[in-house]
């Protein structure tokens, strides 16, 4: 089997719905921390328009970025799901889910991981790692979304 195929998969609709429901619950509970990767090594060679920093500042200019991300992540649906990917750099962490949404007539690529672990060693807090929240370099196609009608 192709290594790339092992790293990417399409989860069943029920699994994706469960993930989205848990994501919303974690955000609404108020106990989740958002870890937003604003500056990424890959961004050094990328057009600034396609970086996390630019996209969030452009879409939510007068908002606290963490609060804006919490709101936007809580609005994700099964229809926004694209795929699930394994993070080779951190193989013991949970898989990352990739979603896509349209904002101001531009596609936004969203890649997140929810870790239900204690990162502060005190309160049992969970965290959501937002690796990507940036304008898509390549426009999405309908077939990118397995659960859109």
Locate each region found by the language model.
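Compact soluble domain cores
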Residues: 2-93
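Weak global preference for isoleucine
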Residues: 10, 27, 34, 82, ...
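Functional cores of ribonucleases/endoribonucleases
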Residues: 74-124
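Enriched for short, Lys/Arg-rich terminal
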Residues: 114-149
